[in-house]
Regions:
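Acidic-enriched, low-complexity/disordered segments with a strong bias for Aspartate over Glutamate
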Residues: 8-9, 26, 30-31, 36, ...
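Cysteine-nucleophile protease catalytic domains, especially the papain-like/related folds used
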Residues: 1-21, 116-134, 146-162
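Catalytic-core signature of thiol
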Residues: 104-114, 131-178
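Cysteine protease-like catalytic core of ubiquitin/ubiquitin-like
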Residues: 39-135
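Intrinsically disordered, low-complexity segments enriched in small/polar residues
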Residues: 16-19, 73, 173-176
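Cysteine protease catalytic domains with a Cys-His-Asp triad
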Residues: 1-57, 61-66
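Intrinsic-disorder/low-complexity coil detector
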Residues: 23, 28, 60, 75, ...
Length: 178
């Protein structure tokens, strides 16, 4: 799995607009502003999982509902049976949505699986989604396959250029400070 430090360094190098940082699921910032974005790990800070479990991305566009990306195509409100953890993301997205007045505070998410279950490139997928404009309503990558996930993963790994494998870093090792 790509480390928090690697994801944060990459986002800073490409000057990702609105970048807040990389967080464990129980340490996401409360002071979200319109235009902010972040990557979070399903694992909380003190759950004993050294490298975390799975990266997801969250974006908070100005004047719009919050957006959530999971490379496996799962929504933020589901209990993750694969990882065996509850998702804190539904409540967080609702609390920090910047939907216009009259529009209920809500969120959207991608419903398409892009990543193979056999790879650990979820962090790279999150970066690609954030750099691609954070759209959850249309296909952000027309050239990617909806069936050949291994090919997709190889392609996103080459595009982002980060390694994918065991990491000495814990997800909470990097925050938004600084």
């Amino acid at each position: 799995m790509t480390s928090a430090a690697e994801l944060d360094d990459y986002a800073r190098q490409v000057k990702l607009r609105g970048w807040r940082g990389v967080f464990p699921s129980d340490q996401m910032p409360d002071d979200i502003r319109p235009g902010d974005c972040l990557i979070a790990n399903y694992s909380p800070l003190h759950d004993g999982v050294r490298n975390g479990t799975h990266w997801v991305a969250l974006a908070f566009p100005r004047g719009a509902h919050a957006r959530y990306f999971d490379s496996m195509g799962r929504g933020p409100e589901v209990w993750d049976g694969t990882l065996g953890v509850d998702s804190p993301f539904k409540t967080y997205l609702r609390r920090h949505s910047f939907a216009p007045k009259g529009m209920p505070h809500r969120y959207s998410w991608n419903r398409v699986q892009w990543q193979s279950r056999q790879t650990e490139v979820c962090g790279e997928w999150c970066l690609l989604w954030l750099m691609s404009g954070c759209d959850t309503t249309r296909d952000p990558w027309p050239g990617f396959s909806r069936v050949n996930f291994a090919k997709n993963d190889a392609r996103v790994r080459a595009m982002i250029g980060l390694r994918a494998g065991p990491s000495p870093h814990r997800p909470p090792s990097v925050g938004s400070a600084g």
